[in-house]
UniProtKB/Swiss-Prot annotation:
Disulfide bonds: none
Function recorded in the entry: Part of the ABC transporter complex UgpBAEC involved in sn-glycerol-3-phosphate (G3P) import. Binds G3P.
Localization: Periplasm
Name used for this protein in its record: sn-glycerol-3-phosphate-binding periplasmic protein UgpB
Gene Ontology BP annotations: transmembrane transport
Keywords: Periplasm, Signal, Transport
Length: 439
């Protein structure tokens, strides 16, 4: 009896130790991100699905605030030796991350983990944004890439006597439509989120205009800003005139206008294609998705949109097991079924060609008109050297400068020319500072 008791106890102890060993063997991989609302739900779902199929690793997603806050937190954490394994960084933080000495290039992560990594699976115009010009390899992995699109309230269009299946194609048409929408009872005709990205950066690319010299900084850090030219000034003047009439309303520097749209306050907004998840969830009216408007007088417009959103950077200083798990997770995200579902649920671009083709085969675009607008904008025409994106140092700070100067226009303190001239001169100081720091 006594021996049996000892034997049973020994078995229990052995099992306990075995389970404990298995638990200890799980490598936790912190993943800091900026996805909130419905997007945050989808990020958690991706992590759960990976964790269920990979018993050796556990992705731990942590929301760290908006893009600016998350980038600052990630860099600060690296300096204190407490960085996450994966950090989501928005597209204009690319130059900052490249110069930070805080990252391990994603192609190197796969190589060291002995996991095959075919970089050609990514949509070229997306991958090009995050590729090292010297090596031709990806520094970070595209994740939630987007372009700005136009969302409009079809019910409000009907009420105003406008065609609900015909969103404005030009900025001139948008100005006319918003006046009619306001006259028909809309308290807000048009609003826009992310004004620097949409009204300056993408407006410039959409019209084939450079944002900065040196091919928007891709060819060197000695670039200077060039978005204070006649076409950009004309565009800001149009918005200023609309603002004075009450047809354009400014709600803030981020995506505040998206909530104003899906709450029914604003009849038209321009926002990230990634806003579709929240709009689909919250809007209680019929809505449509259209391409970004272009200036009717601009030659050869529209050209192609440049991407926004973010990519996933792998932080330096982690152990071998962590990097192996990171590589497994990043590979998981590129699986056609996973990447296609992420695209379909969120409104972000399909980051791989296979995800795009699978989405078409499934008939998703036929069932969801407008869901392919962001992709069509990106592929509208072959990109020019200065419409493939931008790679400018201190770009987050430059966007803040642009916000400040445009706010001077909306409050009537500055003319569009004065605001853009000042934004360029202030921004050039930041570019020069970045160049000197990273020589």
């Amino acid at each position: 009896m006594f021996n049996n008791a000892i034997r049973k106890t020994s078995i229990c102890v052995a099992l306990t130790l075995a389970f404990s060993a298995n638990a200890m063997a799980v490598t936790e991989i912190p993943f800091w991100h900026s996805m909130e609302g419905e997007l945050g739900v989808e990020v958690n779902s991706l992590a759960d699905r990976f964790n269920q199929s990979h018993s050796d690793y556990k992705i731990v997603p942590v929301y760290k605030g908006n893009y600016e806050q998350s980038l600052a937190a990630g860099i600060a954490a690296f300096r204190s030796g407490k960085a996450p394994a994966i950090l989501q960084v928005y597209e204009v933080g690319t130059a900052t991350m490249m110069a930070s000495k805080a990252i391990k290039p994603v192609f190197q992560v796969f190589k060291d983990a002995n996991i095959n990594f075919d970089e050609s699976v990514f949509v070229p115009t997306v991958a090009g944004y995050y590729t090292d010009a010297k090596t031709g390899h990806l520094l970070s992995q595209p994740f939630n890439s987007s372009t700005p699109v136009l969302y409009y309230n079809k019910d409000a269009f009907k009420k105003a006597g406008l065609n609900p299946d015909q969103p404005p194609k030009t900025w001139q048409e948008l100005a006319e439509d918003t006046a009619k929408l306001r006259a028909a009872g809309s308290s807000c005709g048009y609003a826009s989120g992310w004004q620097g990205w949409i009204q300056i950066e993408n407006f410039s690319a959409w019209h084939g205009q450079p944002i900065a010299s040196r091919n928007n900084g891709f060819d060197g850090t000695d670039a200077v800003l060039e978005f204070n030219k006649p076409l950009q000034v004309k565009h800001i003047q149009l918005l200023s005139d609309m603002n004075k009439k009450g047809d354009f309303t400014y709600f803030g520097r981020k995506d505040e206008s998206t909530a104003k749209f899906y709450n029914g306050d604003c009849a038209i907004t321009t926002a990230s294609s990634g806003s579709l998840a929240d709009i689909r969830h919250y809007a209680k009216f019929n809505y449509g998705v259209g391409m970004m408007p272009y200036d009717a007088d601009a030659k050869d417009a529209p050209q192609n949109a440049i991407i926004g959103g973010a990519s996933l950077w792998v932080m330096d200083g982690k152990d071998k097991d962590t990097y192996k798990g990171v590589a497994e997770f990043l590979q998981f995200l590129t699986q056609p079924e996973i990447a296609a579902e992420w695209h379909q649920k969120t409104g972000y671009l399909p980051i791989t060609t296979a995800a795009y083709e699978l989405t078409k085969q499934q008939g998703f675009y036929d069932k969801n008109p407008g869901a392919d607008v962001a992709t069509r904008q990106m592929l509208n025409k072959p990109p020019l050297p200065y419409t493939k994106g931008l790679r400018l140092g201190n770009m987050p700070q430059i966007r803040t400068v642009v916000d400040e100067e445009l706010e001077g226009v909306w409050t009537g303190k500055k003319t569009p020319q004065q605001a853009l001239d000042t934004a360029v001169s202030r921004g050039d100081v930041l570019l020069h500072r970045f160049e000197q720091t990273n020589k």
